[in-house]
Amino acid sequence: MTSVDINNNNNNNNNSNSNIIETKLIGHKDTVLCISSHNKKEIIASGSDDCTVRIWDLNTNKSIQSIVEGFQGNPVNNVCFDQDFTLYCSYDNIIVSFDLRQPNVILKEFNTQYKFNTEEINQLSFDSKYQYLAACDDSGQTKIIDVTKNKLVESLNKKHTNIATGCVFRPNSKNELITSSMDFSIIHWDFLKAKVLHRDTFKEGSLPQNISKSQQQQQETTEPNRMLNPPFVTSVDCSNNSKYVAISMGDGTIVINEISSFKQYLKINSIHKSSIQQVHYPKYLENNYQRLISFGNYDKKIVIWDVSEDMNTKVSSSLLSNDEKNNERIKTWLEHSEKINCLTTSNLKNNAIFVADLSNDLKLLSIQ
């Protein structure tokens, strides 16, 4: 097995309002593209441009297994654990699964292969019972696979008119899924019936209704990104209480909707100086609907927000957001040393963020 070096240091390259300890998990030979944490085991998986996947032990921060074949020489764009011992990986439009119970340190053979998607897959996501796997792709479609039967059960298509950027199941629901797209919209589905329950569209250049000219001028001043970047939806995530869906957009905006009504719960404008790449509810919090993590596409800034009901009441007296209100919400922020590809957290490791950036090293950021 390739040796793995661990470097622990105070993150002097980062500007931050908290003490951040950065640990490098060294093993990949090219950029890390994706990360997934296991909900029951203290392990994470990472996929890379080096066309391999590594499994990491969170107790030692060392690589304990690597998957070096099965991807036909393609970068691994997505990884996703089931509840037991199987890891699902995607490259191009293909999904393959691996049994991690194998005693081998280096894995070469996959268990199952799915070729239901027609274009490159952008996200893999499991439902709460780990029966259904969703895979959204560049065609705008999302495929629903029953992994217990190894068959396609539904294709969610003809509703998104551009790339499907994200898919997430509503926790503890029987049949609800939310997808996001570059067509400026998110859709709330009954995925077993391929039925649209709700749709929210964030059209380019749209402004709230019934605002004054001075308010519009203020929005143009405080939301310069909206004038430059269209509000395509880059990611979605659901809170673990099943009540909220968080949405990140290309104009630097974060929106949270109540899922049942699909009405807007809150909106945060223009903290990132670029499009927002991802929003993520931290898994290490029991009530994670009170906090939200975001990072920008090019500004390299990671922000942890207070999105609790108490804070929302405090700052919602005005229709329009501003820097002062944003500062009230910010619990932690840091400027990472590299452009970030994705991040995740683990319910088994408190106050820790795992970051995949343009370097070859997976980063563990421990918030003190």
From Swiss-Prot:
Disulphide linkage map: none
Record-linked InterPro entries: WD40/YVTN_repeat-like_dom_sf, WD40_repeat_CS, WD40_repeat_dom_sf, WD40_rpt, WDR53
Gene3D superfamilies given in the database record: YVTN repeat-like/Quinoprotein amine dehydrogenase
Name of the protein in question: WD repeat-containing protein 53 homolog
Positions annotated as WD repeat: 27-66, 71-108, 116-155, 159-199, 228-267, 271-315
Family named by the database record: Belongs to the WD repeat WDR53 family.
Name of a matching Pfam family: WD40
Region (Disordered): 207-231
Keywords linked to the UniProt accession: Repeat, WD repeat
SMART domains attached to this UniProt entry: WD40
Gene encoding the protein: wdr53
